[in-house]
C-alpha cells in the first residue's frame, strides 16, 4: 500500500480516491496533499499560491461586476430598491451615487460604470491569476525576493501583515475622501427625508469615537452599532484608517517581540486560522450593523429595520385614529396601558402596544416628533408631515421578516406584501458565514497547534472502507 502519511512534518496527507491521478505534475506523493486539498498543495510554492489568490480575487470581482450589471438591467425606478431584491445597488446608493432627495434614484449610469469597471478589473486579475498559476515561476524567493517568503520567517510575516494593514487604511480613507470631497454620501437624517451631502464637520474627538467601543451592547446602548450620525461614521474611518496605516508601518519596521514569538504559532495553517477568526468577527459585527443600524444602511435602500417597521405600524394607526377623532394622549388599550402612547422604564413617552419593546428606536421620520421627554403630544397632534406618514406606511408593510417562501412582513400586519428584505438577506448571510468561518478558525487553529506540538499525523485511515473499493476510473 502507498504511504498514507507524508514524511514532511506538519503536512498531514489525505488519501487519494485514485492513486494514479496527478494534476499538473503535483500528485500526492510529491506534495503531501491529495488533489482535492486545493491550495494546500501549493503551500510551499509561493508563485503558484500567488496565482491562486489573484485568480480568486478575479472571481470575486467578476461576480461583483456581473451581479452589478444584472441588478442595473432589472432595476425599476418606480419601486424602492428593497422591494426588488437588490443587494449591491443599495451599497452604491448609500455612497451617494445616482440618488437625490428622499433616496430617489435619478441616474443609473454610475451603477453601470461600476459594473463595467469591476468586469474589466476581473479580466486583469484573471489574466494575472492564470499567468502565475500556469506560466510564472513556481517560487518567488529566487527571482523576486521581496515577494518571496517562508512561513516560519516571523519578520517577513509581520511585514506582510503591515502591508495588509496599510491597504486597509487606504480603503478607509477612500470613504473619507468620497464623503468630504467627491460628491458626499447619502445621509438618511438630512432634513425632509434624506439627501446626498458632503460631510463638513467630522467627529474626531477620541472620547466620542472610542466611547462607542465602551458602550454596552444591550438595550438602548447598542455598542458601535448604535451610531446614528454620519459625522461620527466618517470620523471613525479617519481614526480607523490612521490606526491601520500607523500599525502597518509599525509592523513593517519592527520585529515581533519575544512574548509574541512565544505566544503565536508561526505556520501557514496558523495564519489561515487567524484570518478566518478575524473574518468571523467581521461577519458577526456586520450582521448586527445591517440588522439594527439605519444610518450606515439607510432604510430607503435596504428597507426598514425590524424595530422601525414595528414602530411605523404604531405610528400609522395613531395617525389614522387621530384623524377619526381618537384622543391618542389618553386612550387606553385592553391591558389598561396607553393604547397609542405610554411611558418607557425611564419615563419617556413612547408608542404603546406591542411595539413598546422597541421604544429606543431612532429613525429620521420619527425623531422630529420627539421632545425632551420622548414623543411630544403637541407635535403628534399638529406637526406630522405627509412625508412622515408616507414613509411609515411604506415601512409598516415591508418589515424585514420574510421567510424562504417570500411571505414578508409583520404577522399582525394584513397589508404586508410578499417580499424578502435585503436587510434580512444581508444580516442572515453574514451571520451564517461568520459562524462557518468561526468553525474553520477552530479547525485550522487546532491542526496548527497540534502540528507545532509535533503530534499532527493526519486521520488514521487504515480501516477506511474506500481503500478496499474499486477506483472510479
UniProtKB/Swiss-Prot annotation:
SUPFAM superfamilies: Photosystem II antenna protein-like. The chain crosses the membrane at residues 69-93, 134-155, 178-200, 255-275, 291-312, 447-471. GO terms for molecular function: chlorophyll binding; electron transporter, transferring electrons within the cyclic electron transport pathway of photosynthesis activity; metal ion binding. It is a multi-pass membrane protein. GO terms for biological process: photosynthetic electron transport in photosystem II. Residues 1-14 form a propeptide. Its main location: plastid. Binds multiple chlorophylls and provides some of the ligands for the Ca-4Mn-5O cluster of the oxygen-evolving complex. It may also provide a ligand for a Cl- that is required for oxygen evolution. PSII binds additional chlorophylls, carotenoids and specific lipids. One of its GO terms (cellular component) is photosystem II. The keyword Ubl conjugation does not apply. [CaMn4O5] cluster binds at residue 367. The modification Phosphothreonine is found at residue 15. Keywords: Acetylation, Chlorophyll, Chloroplast, Chromophore, Manganese, Membrane, Metal-binding, Phosphoprotein, Photosynthesis, Photosystem II, Plastid, Thylakoid, Transmembrane, Transmembrane helix. It is found in: Plastid, Chloroplast thylakoid membrane. The modification N-acetylthreonine is found at residue 15. The keyword Nucleus does not apply. Belongs to the PsbB/PsbC family. PsbC subfamily. HAMAP family: PSII_PsbC_CP43. PSII is composed of 1 copy each of membrane proteins PsbA, PsbB, PsbC, PsbD, PsbE, PsbF, PsbH, PsbI, PsbJ, PsbK, PsbL, PsbM, PsbT, PsbX, PsbY, PsbZ, Psb30/Ycf12, at least 3 peripheral proteins of the oxygen-evolving complex and a large number of cofactors. It forms dimeric complexes. NCBIfam families: psbC. One of the components of the core complex of photosystem II (PSII). It binds chlorophyll and helps catalyze the primary light-induced photochemical processes of PSII. PSII is a light-driven water:plastoquinone oxidoreductase, using light energy to abstract electrons from H(2)O, generating O(2) and a proton gradient subsequently used for ATP formation. This is Photosystem II CP43 reaction center protein. The gene is psbC.
Amino acid at each position: 500500500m502507498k504511504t498514507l502519511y507524508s514524511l514532511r512534518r506538519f503536512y498531514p496527507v489525505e488519501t487519494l480516491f485514485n492513486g494514479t491521478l496527478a494534476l499538473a505534475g503535483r500528485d500526492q506523493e510529491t506534495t503531501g496533499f491529495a488533489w482535492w486539498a486545493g491550495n494546500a498543495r501549493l503551500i510551499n510554492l509561493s508563485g503558484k499560491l500567488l496565482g491562486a489568490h489573484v485568480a480568486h480575487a478575479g472571481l470575486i470581482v467578476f461576480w461583483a461586476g456581473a451581479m452589478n450589471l444584472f441588478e442595473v438591467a432589472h432595476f425599476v425606478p418606480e419601486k424602492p430598491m428593497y422591494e426588488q431584491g437588490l443587494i449591491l445597488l443599495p451599497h452604491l446608493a448609500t455612497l451617494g451615487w445616482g440618488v437625490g432627495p428622499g433616496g430617489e434614484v435619478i441616474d443609473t449610469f454610475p451603477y453601470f460604470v461600476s459594473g463595467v469597471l469591476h468586469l474589466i478589473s476581473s479580466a486583469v486579475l484573471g489574466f494575472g491569476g492564470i499567468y502565475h498559476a500556469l506560466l510564472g515561476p513556481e517560487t518567488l524567493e529566487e527571482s523576486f525576493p521581496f515577494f518571496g517568503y517562508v512561513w516560519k520567517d516571523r519578520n517577513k510575516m509581520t511585514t506582510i501583515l503591515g502591508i495588509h494593514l496599510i491597504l486597509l487604511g487606504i480603503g478607509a480613507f477612500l470613504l473619507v475622501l468620497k464623503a468630504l470631497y467627491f460628491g458626499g454620501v447619502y445621509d438618511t437624517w438630512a432634513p425632509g427625508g434624506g439627501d446626498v451631502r458632503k460631510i463638513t464637520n467630522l467627529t474626531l474627538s477620541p472620547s466620542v469615537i472610542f466611547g462607542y467601543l465602551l458602550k454596552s451592547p444591550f438595550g438602548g446602548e447598542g455598542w458601535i452599532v448604535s451610531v446614528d450620525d454620519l459625522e461620527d461614521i466618517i470620523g471613525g474611518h479617519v481614526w480607523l484608517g490612521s490606526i491601520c496605516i500607523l500599525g502597518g508601518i509599525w509592523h513593517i519596521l519592527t520585529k515581533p517581540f519575544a512574548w509574541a514569538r512565544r505566544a503565536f504559532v508561526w505556520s501557514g495553517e496558523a495564519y489561515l486560522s487567524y484570518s478566518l477568526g478575524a473574518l468571523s468577527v467581521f461577519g458577526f459585527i456586520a450582521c448586527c450593523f445591517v440588522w439594527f443600524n439605519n444610518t450606515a444602511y439607510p432604510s430607503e435602500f435596504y428597507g426598514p429595520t425590524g424595530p422601525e417597521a414595528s414602530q411605523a405600524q404604531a405610528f400609522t394607526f395613531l395617525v389614522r385614529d387621530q384623524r377619526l377623532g381618537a384622543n391618542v394622549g389618553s386612550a387606553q388599550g385592553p391591558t389598561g396601558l396607553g393604547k397609542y402612547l405610554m411611558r418607557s422604564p425611564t419615563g419617556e413617552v413612547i408608542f404603546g402596544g406591542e411595539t413598546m419593546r422597541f421604544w429606543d428606536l431612532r429613525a429620521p421620520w420619527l425623531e422630529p416628533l420627539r421632545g425632551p421627554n420622548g414623543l411630544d403630544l403637541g407635535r403628534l397632534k399638529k406637526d406630522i408631515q405627509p412625508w412622515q406618514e408616507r414613509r411609515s406606511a411604506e415601512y409598516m408593510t415591508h418589515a424585514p421578516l420574510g421567510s424562504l417562501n417570500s411571505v414578508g412582513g409583520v404577522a399582525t400586519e394584513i397589508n404586508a406584501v410578499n417580499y424578502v428584505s435585503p436587510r434580512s438577506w444581508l444580516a442572515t448571510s453574514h451571520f451564517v458565514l461568520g459562524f462557518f468561518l468561526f468553525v474553520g478558525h477552530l479547525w485550522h487553529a487546532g491542526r496548527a497547534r497540534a502540528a507545532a506540538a509535533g503530534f499532527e499525523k493526519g486521520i488514521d485511515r487504515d480501516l477506511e472502507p474506500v481503500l478496499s473499493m474499486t477506483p472510479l476510473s
